[in-house]
Design a protein with these regions (language model features):
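Predominantly flavin-linked oxidoreductase catalytic cores and closely associated redox partners
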Residues: 2, 10, 80, 84-85, ...
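Active-site-proximal substrate-binding core of FAD-dependent oxidoreductases
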Residues: 2-4, 16, 291-297, 309, ...
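N-terminal FAD cofactor-binding segment of flavoenzymes
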Residues: 2-58
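A short alpha-helix-loop-beta-strand transition element characteristic
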Residues: 33-49, 100, 166-174, 321
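Short FAD-binding loop at a beta-strand-to-alpha-helix junction that anchors the flavin cofactor
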Residues: 216-218, 277-296, 448-453
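Flavin (FAD/FMN) cofactor-binding core of flavoprotein oxidoreductases
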Residues: 252-273
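Extended, hydrophobic alpha-helical segments in both membrane/secreted and soluble proteins
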Residues: 279, 283-289, 301-315, 443, ...
Length: 483
């Protein structure tokens, strides 16, 4: 019996909401589409060399490339374009794709199982009233729903909680990745070059680093990832990224160029010990919705693809979710996560101890019996009154964008100012009382799009939500200390 497969895509087209610029391992693609290199995706550059540096404010030194970050045989791609390219292959195989529709809720059957998704109402104003363009949402019924909505998706979050899928796993931990695609001056990009840095502008207590992927046509994808388990309530990941761009190693590459696009998205960093159960009545989780990203490799695309392919094989054979969790955990996806399971939590005690742990785990291929624990990111934030600010030695900036609002201009997300506010605070009074005193309103700094802003009214300070700025990175949902 043939299965009907439908993909619900919230972007106007497949790939529209994907942050482009990534290095992929081609193994799963080789299995899925043998001969794909004869007709590759629109942007596909073989990696020609790796560089990794430790940065100080005005200096640097080259580090040996760890085995996990050696990219010989891998490809630099535009991930958005690659997703669109894959969509064409899927449609040719009979998959129905519906772009421009966001799954707003889960449809449950009478016995409490997942029975599909609910597409939200469209054409509603900020007060919830229908406009001329109103279209009522619809229910999509399905015997099995595959959640592939990425990191901290709101439907996946609901299901993980409802079915207690994380009951036997550690708390998930995350990073915030901010990325820009630049058109640099002719001759500055070296197609195929992959660069990573650690160190400045981060202090040694904050996990993170950068990536620069050199593509063709004078384009480079440049980005910065910060672990969201940081303690400093005044830290701004966006500012750290902009500071990094002004390092003497990086700034000459960007001077004379221009930003093409930008965006931000959280990534799952918990790995092996934070992976929830990935099956439930009527549904399964794949990719970053489950948390399959390999942090030491700084890669998740091949893991997401492999988990999706396993899901397809499983459902083609059984037509039901039961057994998929066992299948995933017995697969190369889980084996890859197990080998590196202690590297990310090894950095909880700082950069140098993290490097030492990473070296031990790499040498032993993760065969030591220990498994280091993960902690919920929001629990790691310290009170403002008791936190001693480090001297970050940050510099004056002159590269674009000038601030977070200017960065939002280049993002691929767009909102109607009159649409319903999708960000809701359960108790706004906490923001102006407890949070102001205890944490100095960290949301005004950890948000990369300046969605949250403390303003003075006649009645005193209040938190203003600039929802139209939102780039849907999910940082606020993760780092809010009160949850």
């Amino acid at each position: 019996e043939d299965l009907m497969v439908a993909v619900i895509e919230k972007g106007a087209e497949v790939g529209a909401h994907i942050l482009s610029g990534a290095v992929i391992e081609p193994g799963p693609l080789d299995e899925l589409l043998p001969g794909w290199k004869d007709q590759p995706p629109p942007v596909c550059v073989p990696v020609e060399g790796d560089q990794i540096y430790y940065l100080k404010k005005n200096g640097r030194f080259r580090l040996p490339t760890p085995p996990q970050q050696k990219n010989h045989g891998n490809y630099i791609v535009s991930l958005g374009a690659m997703c669109g390219w894959l969509a064409g292959h899927a449609e040719a195989a009979g998959v129905d794709i519906f772009p421009g529709f966001a799954a707003a809720g889960i449809r449950y059957t009478d016995d409490g199982a997942v029975g599909g998704v609910i597409i939200g109402d469209m054409g509603v104003d900020i007060h919830g009233n229908p406009k001329d363009t109103y279209m009522q949402g619809i229910e999509i019924h399905a015997p099995v729903t595959v959640l592939a909505e990425g990191c901290r998706g709101h439907l996946s979050k609901e299901l993980i909680s409802k079915f207690e899928l994380d009951r036997d796993s550690d708390p998930q931990t995350y990073g915030i990745g901010i990325k820009e695609l630049w058109k640099v001056a002719p001759g500055k990009a070296t197609p195929g070059r992959v660069q990573h840095t650690v160190g400045w502008p981060l202090d040694r207590a904050i996990y993170g680093g950068s990536f620069i992927y050199h593509m063709e046509d004078d384009q480079v994808a440049i980005g910065f990832v910060c672990g969201l388990d940081y303690a400093d309530p005044d830290f701004s990941p966006f500012e750290a990224f902009q500071q990094f761009k002004h390092h003497p190693l990086i700034k000459p590459l960007l001077e004379g160029g221009e930003i093409i696009s930008s965006g931000a998205r959280t990534i799952t960093e918990g790995g092996y010990q934070s992976l929830p159960r990935v099956e439930m009545p009527g549904a399964i989780l794949v990719g970053d919705a489950a948390g399959t990203l390999n942090v030491p490799k700084i890669k998740g695309t091949h893991q997401a693809m492999r988990s999706g392919m396993l899901a397809a094989e499983h459902l083609a054979e059984t037509s039901k979710p039961a057994g998929f969790d066992e299948r995933l955990r017995a697969s190369p996806v889980m084996a890859e996560l197990h080998k590196v399971r202690n590297i990310r939590p090894g950095f909880h005690k700082g950069l140098w101890k993290g490097f030492f742990t990473a070296a031990i785990e790499t040498i032993t291929a993760g065969k030591l019996k220990r498994t280091l624990p993960q902690h919920a990111d929001h629990s790691q934030l310290q009170r403002a009154s008791g936190f001693e600010q480090p001297d970050r030695q940050w510099v004056e900036r002159d590269l674009a964008p000038r601030d977070r609002l200017a960065s939002v201009y280049f993002a691929t997300t767009a909102h109607d100012e009159d649409q319903p506010v999708h960000l809701q605070i359960l108790d706004p009074e906490v923001c102006t009382t407890r949070c102001s005193i205890e944490f100095n309103n960290p949301c005004t700094r950890f948000c990369p799009a300046q969605v949250y802003e403390m303003v003075e009214d006649v009645d005193g300070p209040r938190l203003q939500i600039n929802a139209a700025n939102c780039v849907h990175c999910k940082t606020c949902d993760i780092k809010d200390p009160y949850q």
